[in-house]
């Protein structure tokens, strides 16, 4: 009997990865990371693939330049990617510009079997056919094939120099036009501050920034199309509720700094059982005695505390999460499943979509399961973030009724 034919339609793979750690220990981590990434490519065999990276180049971009070049070269020329004969790479390497630098890197790969792929020129306001492999870096501001913005400094005044922002590209694949937005939102600067209120002050800052991005991508300047927003949203569990749940029967001890009287540590102890310490909380310490709670059943019992997306429920959709929190994993190359005791584990890395993009995916979901939302490298050290991906198919003809609207056929 002949082998089963591949599912019809155009296979799409969207991956988000905060890769800051990879450039701090390139020898060990990059090899692992690339092997696991290639495995996902091999499994899902996408025709169109997007990889959105945050903290590209690590904490010190200047020192990591050679590692960056090597990583990009490896991705573009590796054996695993040899069937992808067209590529676009956009790297924000302008690290000397506090005003503009976002440390975002966006990679787009097109399979040789894929015909007629177009990318939108935001300046000329028309689609252009994608040919060859091109890398753009340094000043992305002058590249007409994308829009890049860094969030205004007053969004996060505590942070002297934040690199948070977003990059948007627009594509036409299989007669479907969509925006792909690479995003990096603000983190929780202090566990103690995050614990004080529910929702936390930080979630309010992320809410404001994400609202700004969504307003930008559907404003009047360009025709509205479906969109996928994927990156490091830095969404955190509602800290106050989590601590109350994890430490229901605990008593709390407050430790203050002798000179300022400022709270520097909270210690939660069991009321009995020799007053065993359950949780220690400091600005950058979240040490819970039993990490298994974040791994049992992939941590899904904690999803009730993952509330930040609910504000956008009419504008952003997400498939059900069935993988464990994607951050903060140990950066020890021998530890693949261990979390660091720095933050409460959370689903920071996500692939979100507009309601119309959701329709596109659901149209494609036939009797066979062709949609997968998961993380990469569950048992291998991938750095402090596990990459997260969405694999789906655009069903044949899914975009046809709209083909005349977004004028994919009117190209240069």
Swiss-Prot record:
Residues that make up the propeptide removed upon maturation: 410-412
Gene Ontology BP annotations: negative regulation of phospholipase C-activating G protein-coupled receptor signaling pathway; phosphatidylinositol dephosphorylation
Residues anchoring lipid (S-farnesyl cysteine): 409
Enzyme Commission no: 3.1.3.56
Class of the enzyme per the UniProt entry, highest EC level: hydrolase
GO molecular function: inositol-1,3,4,5-tetrakisphosphate 5-phosphatase activity; inositol-1,4,5-trisphosphate 5-phosphatase activity; inositol-polyphosphate 5-phosphatase activity
InterPro entries membership: Endo/exonu/phosph_ase_sf, INPP5A, IPPc
Membrane topology: Lipid-anchor
Regulation: Inhibited by EDTA and 2,3-bisphosphoglycerate.
Compartment(s) where it occurs, according to its Swiss-Prot or TrEMBL record: Cell membrane; Cell projection, Dendrite
Domain of life: Eukaryota
Subunit composition and interactions: Interacts with TASOR.
Name of the featured protein: Inositol polyphosphate-5-phosphatase A
